[in-house]
Each structure stands twice: as C-alpha cells, then as structure tokens.
Amino acid sequence: MLIPGLPVAASVLVLPGGTDNSTTPFSRRQPAPMRMYPFTLSLRALPRVVVHQAVYDVHGWNGEHNSPLAPAQAALDRLIDAHPDSPVILVGHSMGGRVAAHLAADKRVAGVLALAPWWQHADWEYIHGEARVLALHGTADQRTYPARTEKGIAQLRERGVDAEFVPIEGGGHAMLDHVWTWQSTSLTFVRSFL
C-alpha cells in the first residue's frame, strides 16, 4: 500500500506459473495467474510496497523460446524504472519460480521467493550471489520436484548465497492447502526487506 508523501520501501514482481509447452494466449483468468491473486493482494496491503503481477504473452515456457522471459523482463525493467531506489523482490510460483531464477541474474534484484518452483537444468544457477532466496515447496507436490528445489537451495548456499528451503509438509503444488503457511511465510520474507 502506497502512503502519500512516503517513499516506496520495496517493489515486488509477482510471476505466475504456466506450463511446459503452450502457445495459448495468456489470460488473467487462467488458473495460474488467479492462484497468485491472494499473494498479490496480501502483498499490496503491506505499507510502502508496490506490487505488480506480470502478464506473459503465452501460457507456456516453450523450450528454447523461453516465452515468459521477455515480458517478465520488461515488467521488471518498468518496475525498477518507476522505483529505482527500492529493493526488488521476485515472487514466482511454479513456472514463475523458474522465471524468477532467470531474472535474478540481474543485480538489481534483491530477493527471490520461489513457491513450488519448476526449476529445470539448474535454473537456480542464474541467481546472483547477493540476492536472498527463500524457496517453499510442498512435500506432496506431484507436478514439480521438492527434492530438486532443496538441491538448488543447497547449491546456492555452497556458493555463499543467503538461501533457505522450507518444506511444506503434505503441501501440494497448487498451494490450496496450508494456505496460512504459504501466505504468512511469503509476507514475512517480503517484510524482511522493509
């Protein structure tokens, strides 16, 4: 929530999920972006925090096309241009967690919150060494791989990155269970930058 007369304390870019391969046009009414609305709304309630939810061109990653990266990078650039003095935190679910890892090669990114990230081919290696990283992953996730996320966080820590893995016991991919844990942990992470 922006407070007139006070500077922005943090900028947050929310990155929704998608799927492996799809050229279906992206819609805000698809389940993946709708799943992130509660996070976006909760984050917007934080004082002096600007929140933008990214909109991709198509619904899929699409192999080497890396389809969501260009629109997500453009959204990140706009957010930074509008608020150059505030730390930027990326919040990504599933494919959005993969997008966040790639965008976090940019040293202007202060933090990455990866929610059940779909990390492939060591995507976490893109994250620069000064970023703080928190990854939450449900232990019952059948779509993405909690063990891979935990491995990625361990490798980031070996590089000296401030990174933490939090397993959500019994949690599934859609984050429809343990809602309070997903939400409160996310809010606490973003608040830590204020």
Describe each region flagged by the PLM.
Residues 1-46:
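Short, surface-exposed "cap/lid" segments of acyl-processing enzymes
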Residues 18, 114-121:
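Active-site nucleophile loop of the alpha/beta-hydrolase fold
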Residues 62-82:
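Alpha/beta-hydrolase active-site loop
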Residues 91-96, 100:
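Gly/Ala-rich beta-loop-alpha elbow adjacent to hydrolase catalytic centers
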Residues 129, 134-141:
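Short beta-strand/loop motif that positions the catalytic acidic residue
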Residues 145-155:
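Short alpha-helix in the alpha/beta-hydrolase fold that links the catalytic acid
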Residues 157-194:
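C-terminal catalytic histidine-bearing segment of alpha/beta-hydrolase fold enzymes
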